[in-house]
């Protein structure tokens, strides 16, 4: 896991996949065909990202979220202030007063957002946390002129150009989605269908929880979480890949993220997390 940078205990456990703040991506030239013109890629900025005390994150919304809904902040399960959730552990609706520094497009902190609760958190099958804030999307936009990042609803595609935007470091990393991992194992934890980056995304500690943004759409397709630091096999800070046949592969220096499309159906009316909703792919307690 990407080190959350909060002390010796967590530093020893969290791996340093550092996601640099998303550098503005160059606009892709529209490719014309006989029938259609593809849209130009959007420049990725820090707008909507947040800095936690130990990690990175972002203010996110589902396509159905309303302006008056309490806003959500997305980060990693291993970034929770309560510590690492154990294998099989799922947190739902836990009170929280955690604060987040909201960043504008250039990476400047413009205000402080406050959580009312940990709406969801786990390190089982995926590595994510969702905080519900005391502010609505409308209040955040009115106060700071910043909109939430939208979550993609479809499975990402290999070869997609992406940017990892770290609010903690105010740095970005740009690369492509290299492929997907059946099971990614690290220490006691196993994550499913993880995103593997091409080598250009050399994320470091503190980038944990950074949004992984599709350069073409500006939507969040994953949340950055780990990387193999020293070539060890399946140990803390050295995840290994396990395919459908049980074959283990170690890729030293390669970093990974967890997909987020499967959590979108879990976000119900009023931005409440409902694990029983149709299509919800998050583990239950």
Model-assigned labels for residue ranges:
Residues 2-72, 82-84, 88-94, 265-285:
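Protease-domain processing segments flanking chymotrypsin-fold serine proteases, especially trypsin-like
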Residues 34-46, 51, 61-63, 81, ...:
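Conserved catalytic-core segment of clan PA serine endopeptidases
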Residues 43-55, 138-146, 171-264:
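Active-site region of chymotrypsin-like
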Residues 52-54, 68-70, 74, 95, ...:
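Extracytoplasmic
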Residues 58-64, 116-122, 132-172:
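Active-site substrate-binding loop(s) of clan PA
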Residues 63-70, 107-109, 185-191:
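Short, solvent-exposed loop/turn segments that connect beta-strands within catalytic domains
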Residues 80-83, 228-230:
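Short glycine/acidic-enriched loop and turn motifs that connect beta-strands
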Residues 108-116, 158-161, 170-185:
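Beta-strand/loop subdomains of soluble extracytoplasmic proteins
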């Amino acid at each position: 896991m990407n080190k959350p940078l909060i002390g010796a205990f967590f530093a020893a456990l969290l791996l340093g996949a550092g996601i640099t703040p998303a550098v503005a991506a160059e606009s892709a030239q529209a490719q014309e065909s006989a029938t259609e013109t593809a849209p130009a890629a959007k420049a990725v900025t820090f707008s909507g990202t947040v800095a936690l005390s130990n990690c990175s994150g972002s203010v996110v919304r589902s396509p159905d979220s309303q302006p008056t809904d309490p806003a959500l902040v997305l980060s990693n399960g291993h970034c929770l202030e309560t510590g690492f959730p154990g294998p099989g552990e799922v947190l739902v609706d836990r009170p929280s007063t955690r604060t987040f520094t909201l960043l504008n497009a250039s990476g400047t902190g413009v205000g402080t957002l406050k959580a009312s609760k940990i709406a969801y958190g786990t390190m089982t099958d995926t590595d994510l946390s969702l905080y519900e804030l005391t502010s609505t999307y409308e209040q955040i936009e009115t106060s700071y002129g910043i909109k939430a990042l939208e979550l993609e609803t479809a499975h990402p595609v290999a070869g997609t150009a992406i940017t990892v935007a770290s609010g903690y470091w105010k740095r970005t990393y740009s690369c492509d989605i290299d492929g997907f991992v059946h099971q990614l194992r690290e220490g006691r934890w196993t994550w499913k269908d993880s995103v593997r980056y091409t080598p250009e995304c050399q994320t470091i500690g503190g980038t944990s929880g950074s949004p992984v943004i599709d350069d073409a759409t500006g939507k969040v397709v994953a949340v950055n979480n780990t990387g193999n630091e020293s070539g060890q096999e399946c140990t803390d800070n050295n995840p290994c890949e396990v395919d459908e046949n049980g074959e283990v592969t170690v890729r030293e220096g390669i970093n990974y993220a967890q997909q987020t499309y499967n959590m979108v159906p879990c976000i119900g009316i009023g931005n409440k997390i409902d694990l029983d909703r149709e299509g919800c792919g998050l583990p239950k307690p």
